[in-house]
Each structure stands twice: as structure tokens, then as C-alpha cells.
């Protein structure tokens, strides 16, 4: 384990003393260091009547147990303090460490003890993580250090788990949205599942906008999947025009109805454990699936601002600006009198996407978004550079396939009976508008692009994203992060995993950082918390995170690709084509080792490079026909230690998100030897070689010169490493599988690779 602590706020000694005493620690700044430490340790073991026993089981050094030390005249030294602290954090002498000083350096221990400043050190110790992934204080509170009294308590600017999760209110309301997506003449009602503590305090809300949470129709999804095999279409040359327009909601007038309570309860809804963490700390949790989902009205519009508006209406209800009913009868209103009106949205993938989209509406009350692996433009999810481009791992999926998956109203037989015929007409229209035949950008996709609306964002934006996420690719966070106005507070956590959550990783205090941030933004704590703009997981060493100023450097290094001309044959023998089509992972494996139809270039790295941004290929290419796909990948090639892209479980159920509540596993990305690591990749329709909105003819056998910008990344290369550049046509994971006979020729002498370099490293 290594410490990467971003959540700690240094406090004046008077405030630290006050906060420690409020928790029951008999410590003052006038006490001798040794006595203060003994009082602290005995309080730690509050569940023991005889605290001598647990002290007897710890050591002060490798020759003396802790009880003996406290009963002796020996002075407290830094080495003894650190040895005791490590044990309180779960590190075991003779198992985890045999030399305290060496181990402190190895784990980058964040606490600096100085004689006469024991109180500050103990204050810091309480909010430092144990080996189990919980802070020492969170662990103590989960065991009953202070009462669970449904009131707010804070330490180091963080809300503590003092809200009772054994006796929660679970209720359902139906919010009226300014939509009629199914055109039945009534405004669509949106089902809202609410979980909140029983308290007199007005609560801020953690809201997860999840089209999945009311069920998914896997059967309909699988039937709708597209066949990937086919010929690449030749498109007529033209310029595409689109219009950015604001969504116009329908009028949703208030109605004079009696006010009552919810009439519907529930026992369980699939939780997001980060929400659970905040539930125990005085935040309501709400789960909303939006239009076209079971329990709600309307059709699934999939990614446009009508869908977003169905979630926005819920935030408006929490702020008294829209109404909710107690049932589908619409005869009694429910008021969110328990809510403060302040909202943080959470969730990964589609859930995080709706967080980003909601932020671009500028809705009042949305204070923070925590958008994880979020889409910023749906075109960039299902298309790329004029090509159909399936998200990684899901060949054959498209937006209308996702519509079928999430239109959970069809899982309710009554709704199916009444609405399916009309819904199928709606779905057919959606399938036509997404224009799978050409792969081009159009108004349908532009209406599902949140980037043109980034200027409306007011909320503090927190993003997490995997630089190995080939499902929601890194371009999504790169684009939205850099599109936000300078007035917006923004933060990004970039890791080397794939499409995964990171809140329960051992190496970074993400939960505590979010607690500190939300306690300031939504609970009125005057924290003056400074969270770095960008926090990046260093790929060159295990469990190391560092802060960077920006995502995307303007400094460039140029690498030559060669001096000759090389060809890429698009066509495969039938058996080989079928083998790759059957299992795209076989194709990827053979591509990386130079066995597929590809130009394979190994570039020796002569300097240390810290890549930050979008790698660009400057290419001179010709095609034997009037069409062509060009795909590219850039690998860090050669065996060395690298991160795996899926976290492993270190300790099952180690993390308690409250008081014996919503336990979850502690995880971390393994750092092991591997043959290669993809740094970036991309696909391009050569007819879109200039830009996305310009479709050009491809003159057969004539040279074309263009720039091919790949997915952004942040990655360290060391002198002596090898960059493997792969240029090929069909990508069996992502693109249409065209097996026609054409050849691409690349003039390497007139081509190069441009790498964005952080802080001039390598220039």
C-alpha cells in the first residue's frame, strides 16, 4: 500500500483540539506527548472495559509491548510514534514491516510527527486510511465511537456516519415532467425511488440518474443487435450542416390539489455504494430511471435533452419548481419538504453521462456532479470519424439497441399491451435517424452532443475515467473537461483501468475527497478545500497518484515512422476472416504480435516522454479503391510491469460504508508484468479525412495527406522503451467488417507521429 492523500485539511491547533474532544478524546495541546498518545490509544479501544489488554497486544518497538512502554519512564520517540500509528492503521509488525523507517518511506506515510506537536499528528492519524481502505476514524465510528443520532457531526471538514441506516424511509413519488414523449396528451410522470434517514434536518441529495434501475430487456436488446460484416459504403461528397438548439419543454402548470404523502413503498433497489456511504452521513439517496422506463411514462429517447429533462424535473421538484404526485392517479401532490434542494449526481457510464448532460442544462440546485466514465457526445460513443464504431467489447450495438435494452416499460405486460405498437413506430424512426449506413454525423447525433452546451454548466464537476476504457473512450472526458468555462470548478481522476468504478481502491482517498468537497458545497462546511484540478495515476510505478495542471499539453515531440512505402491488404482469406469475426479478441492478440494484416512499426524511445494529450499521426496514404478504413493503435511494447485494466479484490467486505452497513470489497489495479499496453487507438473513414462534417471523394491510387488524431492519454515512457505503431484497415472489435479487395499504401517517409509532451519532458 502507498498513501496518496488529497482529502486532508490542515487545521489550527485550537480547532483540531476542539474536534478531537468532541469525539471524546481526552487530549489537550498542553499534555505531554506520551500522555496524550496513551489517552488516544485507550480511547481507540473504547469497546474494551480493560484497555490494558489491547495495549498489551501492540508494540512500541520490536522489543517492548505498548502497555509496558506506557508504564515506563522511556520518552516517546518518532520511531515509537510511527510504529504505534502503523499498527492502529492495520499494518502488522513482522508481517507487513520489520523496519519502521524503511516501511514509512515505502508507503509514503503522510503524517509528520514532531516533538511537542502530538495533537496535530493524532488529528491527522484519525483521517488517514487503514490498510483496509477505511480511515481510522470511519472504522471507529462504525464500531460505535459516538452515537448514531441522526444529526450531523463533522471532523476535518467531513460528515461522519452518524445517521441511522437500520431505520430508513423508502418511498416512491411520481414527478411531473414538461414532456409528452409518447404523445398521449398527458405530461410524462417520472418514477422516483427515495431513501432517506429519519431526521429533522433538511437533507442534500445524492441522485443517480440510471435508465437501467427499473430493469432491462436483454431479449429485445439481443434481437436488435446488428451484424458487423458488410461492405463499407462509398458516400457522396458533401458538407454536413447541423444546428445547435436549446430544448423547449412543454408548459407544466401547477395544479390545485391536496398535499399528502407518498402512497408507495419499496424494500430494495440496487444501490451504488458511494451513495450508501453518503446516506450514512446525512444525504438522501434517490434513484431515477427517466422517461420510457418501468413505472414512468413516455418513450425512451436515448440521450437527447428530452430524456435529460425528465431527470431535470426531479431536481426541480427537490427545489419546489415542479410537482410530484403520490400515485399515477395524479390527485394528490407530494412536497419534498425534507430536502435542502442541493443535489449531487453520481454513477458510471450511462449514469455518469446523465450527470454530465444535467450539468449542461444549468439547472438550479445541482451543486456537484460526480460523472464516472461518462459520455460527452453519443456520436463519439457509437461512431468515430465517419465510421460506425462499436463501443469496446460490444460489437453490433447501436443507440437503438440500447433503447430496446432500457425501454423497460415493455417488461410490464399492461404497458406492453397498450403502448408497444406505437413504441415500435417510434423505434423504427430512431433507427432510421441514426443512419448506420453512412456512419455520418447528423442532426440526430448533434441533439445528443452535450459539448455545445458546456457553456451553461454551473455545477462543480468531478470526473473519473479509465485511460484503458475502450467502451466510453478517453476522448469523452478530454472533450468535456476542456470545454468547460473557466468559471467552473472542475476535477478529474484519471486511472489506468477500463470501464470501472474507483471509489473503493486502496491507493487513493477518493471517498474522503468527495466527502470533504460535498460537505463544503452542500452542508455548509467552510473547508477552503483545495482539490487538484487533475489527479493522474502514474503508470510507471505501483499505487502512485500525482496532480497535473491540465489534460492536453501544447508541447510536441515528433517521431519519424520510416523511409519507405508499406502496404496494408484489407482482404483476408475466408477462414481467417470468419475466425476473426467469431472472436475479435483473437484478432487483437494477433494484431499486437504482428500476425494480422497491418503495418507494424517499432520505434525505439531515445528520451523519457510524459505523454499528455492526443497523439496525432501525420500521414500520406493512397487507396487502390475509392474507399478505405484506416485504423491505428500505439502500444508500449515489450515485457515490463504494467497495470492490469480490471481491479482485483484485496479484501472482501473490508469497507464499512456506515455502521455495519453496505460493506464492500477493497480493490486495486494489479501491477504485473505484461507484454504490451495500448496507449491509444482510433479509426477513420478516409472520406472524412479532413474533418467530421466534410465528406470527400477518395481518388483511387492518388496520394492523400492528412492528420489522424487518436484517443487522448496520459502515459510515461522511459528511454529504452519501444513504441509499436500498428496501421491496419478493419478493426474486428469496433468497425464494420469489410473484407473487400483493396490495399492502402502508406508513405512512411512523408509521415510521422506527433506526441504531446508534459512540461517539455523529452524535448
Swiss-Prot record:
One of its GO terms (molecular function) is aminopeptidase activity. GO terms for biological process: proteolysis. GO terms for cellular component: cytoplasm. The keyword Hydrolase applies. The active site is at residues 349, 469, 499. It is found in: Cytoplasm. SMART domains: PepX_C (SM00939), PepX_N (SM00940). It catalyses: Hydrolyzes Xaa-Pro-|- bonds to release unblocked, N-terminal dipeptides from substrates including Ala-Pro-|-p-nitroanilide and (sequentially) Tyr-Pro-|-Phe-Pro-|-Gly-Pro-|-Ile. InterPro entries: AB_hydrolase_fold, Galactose-bd-like_sf, Pept_S15_Xpro, PepX_N_dom, PepX_N_dom_sf, Xaa-Pro-like_dom, Xaa-Pro_dipept_C. Removes N-terminal dipeptides sequentially from polypeptides having unsubstituted N-termini provided that the penultimate residue is proline. Homodimer. HAMAP family: Aminopeptidase_S15. Belongs to the peptidase S15 family. This is Xaa-Pro dipeptidyl-peptidase. It comes from Streptococcus macedonicus. The lineage of its organism: Bacteria, Bacillati, Bacillota, Bacilli, Lactobacillales.
